[in-house]
Structures are given as C-alpha cells and as structure tokens.
Amino acid sequence: MLILTIETSCDETAAAVVRDGRTVLSSIVATQVKDHAVYGGVVPEIASRKHLESIPVVIDEALRTASVSLDAIEGVAVTQGPGLAGALLVGTAVAKAIAFARRLPIVGVNHIEGHLSAIFLEREVAFPFVALAVSGGHTHLYRVDGIGRYTTLGQTRDDAAGEAFDKVAKLLGLPYPGGVEIDRLAAEGDPASISFPRPLLHDGSFNFSFSGLKTAVLNHVRKNPVQEDGQQLRDLCASFQRAACDVLVTKTLLAAETEGIGRVVVAGGVACNSALRRDMAREAADRGIELAIPSPSLCSDNAAMLAVPGDFYLSRGISDGLSLDALVNWPLDTIRTRLES
C-alpha cells in the first residue's frame, strides 16, 4: 500500500511517501528552528502560520522526490495528536482535504506511536519490548505488545527530559535549540565535576521528574557563575547531562528487567543525544538487553514514522473518515480501543 503521511504536531512541517509501511520513497521536513530561535522556544501561533506556508511545498516535494503523483496514493495518515492545537489543525485539515478530493481512506496516528514505530523503518524488533519515548514534550515508558497495544509503565511527573534540557540551556544563555548545544559542550566537559541530583532514581517506580534537577542547576549557577563558553560551562553541561541520562537509562533498563523483556527501544528527539545513546548502549549490553535506537533523522519529528502504524491500520480497514479531528491530548494506551472496535 502506498500512503502519504503528514506531520505538523509542533514546529516541523513534514510529509513522506512510504510503501507497505516500511519502504520510504521520500521524507521531507521543513524546520522552523530559525523562526523560533529569537524567542528561545516554540511560539504556537508562529508555528501554525509557518505550517500553513510550508505544507503545500513540503507535500509537493515529497511526491516529486518519490516520483509519484497523488493518483498513485492509496491512503493518507496524519498526526492527529498529541501536540499544539493550531499546528495539528493545519495537518489534519490538509490531510482530510486530500482524502476527500481523492476519495482515499484516512487514519489519524498518535505522534508518540509514530516515534515508537520509527525503528521499523530501519530494522525489525520482536514484540514485546519496552520503549522509552523521550522528547521535549514527553518522557514515558511503555510496554509494547504490538502496533496499537501499549501499556504505560511510567511517565514524568513534571518536566519532560527534553524540556529540562532546553530550560537549562536557556538559563545558561545557550542558543536554541538548547539540547543540541548542551550535547555539543558536554562532549568537552567533565561529567563528574559537579554532583547533581538524580530525581526518583531509587523510588521503586518507573516515573520521572526533572524539575528538581533543573532547579539544582539554577541554584548552582547562582552561586557559581560560569564564563561564557569556558571550561566551567562545559563541565556544567556534562554534569547535568550525565545526571539526566543516568535516570533515563536506569529506569528504562529496570523496567525491561521487571517486565521480563529483553528488548528496549528508545525514540523521540532526545534519543538524538550522543551521551544517552552511548550510555544506554553500554548498560544494555552489560545486562544482555537488546537495544534499538533509530538513526537521528528518524528520532526527530518526521512524517515517515507515521507510515508504520498508518499502513498497519489502513491495511486492516481501520480508518477515521472526514470526522477526524485534532487531539491535543491523546494518551497512547487508549489506542487499544481502535483494535477492539
């Protein structure tokens, strides 16, 4: 099945053409980083306007790169949520217009389900597995028993990990997007130079909390001002990053061991972080756990990842029709009802 996928949940306008939920013929992403950098974060109104400007061009480019026309498309998958309301509405409106004009089946895909499924565009992973979805808006642990079959094991109680990275970067005066800058500076820093807390590390749950870690960094900077782009800044970034990664790695692998599952998938924008990828790989290998992390281009927001669940649902006759609407909040473990209806 040849499907067109559209992603506009936050600040990336993306479209892709994918065959049979595995073969990516094109994947186009228009970023808005420069538009939001001056504000130090995503401005929802600006994001929506940029989506409106970019989406026709992005879809045309996806079709052109795939060497297909809309006549060849057999279905449409679009990010339905969670995400920014205005941004989601742009994508869903365009997707429904295409589906209506071409009389195509359309299905809404959960943004997090897309991230957890991205790995299947590069390799197969046997079910069940434990998945860490870690990004600017989400830090969740799931047991995944199949497409559409998710059980929440733990989640952040406050800030998402990516949000903590961005907020720490902002208080340090680093450019947006901050997570990338922290990763870059940390590579030349000493992660043992500052002892930051590891919130909830040994509380017996699979939940996360990053607000306390963020506050600890703020208090340290107030007492120990750092020079711009000096070694102290590099050491601070490395120490903060190590603390955050320690919690993510420890909780994820403990969840896998507790569930009796020997496979872990890490997905989402923060999965691009070099320290997280390295530390997770080392610790997983030491425990005999199979680890799968998509390439960085598939960790950040993209439309190709939607094709895995999109094709799964559409090929089984599961679609939403033109009543599909944006869902700002859409818990992943509620998707199971789609398979049961």
From Swiss-Prot:
Catalytic activity from the UniProt record: L-threonylcarbamoyladenylate + adenosine(37) in tRNA = N(6)-L-threonylcarbamoyladenosine(37) in tRNA + AMP + H(+)
Gene Ontology CC terms, in alphabetical order: cytoplasm
Essential cofactor(s): Fe(2+)
Localization of this protein: Cytoplasm
Alphabetical GO biological process terms: tRNA threonylcarbamoyladenosine modification
Gene3D superfamilies, sorted: 3.30.420.40
Ligand binding (Fe cation): 111, 115, 301
Top-level EC class: transferase
Annotated positions binding substrate: 133-137, 166, 179, 183, 273
Cofactor, free-text remark: Binds 1 Fe(2+) ion per subunit.
HAMAP family in the cross-refs: TsaD (MF_01445)
Protein family: Belongs to the KAE1 / TsaD family.
Protein name (database record): tRNA N6-adenosine threonylcarbamoyltransferase
Gene: tsaD
